[in-house]
Amino acid sequence: NKPRSNIETVNDLDGDVVNLFECIRRDPERLGRLVYFTPYSRETYEATYLSEIPKDPFERAARFLVKCNQGYGFRTNEVRVGWKRDIQGRERAYAARNWTELPEGIFQAAERLRGVQIECRSAVGVISRFNAPNVLIYCDPPYVLSARSGGKRQYKHEMTDRDHLELLAALKRHQGP
């Protein structure tokens, strides 16, 4: 919800995340329609792990959204974590309802991504490239593995302790606020 800056860049090493952003920006109606007509179902979720990765970028983005939103923990790696379902006794149903609200979220994201540059590079490389006093960096790396319950891997591109130290050094060198 922040106001736009003159130059904005979004970066993620995960090509599926970048593909999702590109599809949202290029044709949010098409992606929204795909999600709208995709059922919230265990079989749909399971199929994302059993089928080949679609060549069509919009089908690939919809598949990625199913994995992230219909499974527990929003994991982006290829580890199946189980289908997220609503159960009796909770204060409200949320899993299926959140899925039905996702197409509207796609349109909101499309509006926000207008004019934004999308990168798929290492965070250290992007931070170095944008090292200027008037550049604000918002950095949201994966948690350190040792700080996670059981050291579970969640992301397609995890960071080692050394990677975290390199990122910290790059952020400390950055001239901006």
Which role fits each region the language model picked out?
Residues 5-7, 115, 175:
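A generic structural signal for alpha->beta connector loops
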Residues 157-177:
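Long, positively charged, glycine-interspersed low-complexity recognition regions
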Residues 8, 12-16, 131, 140, ...:
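Acidic side chains
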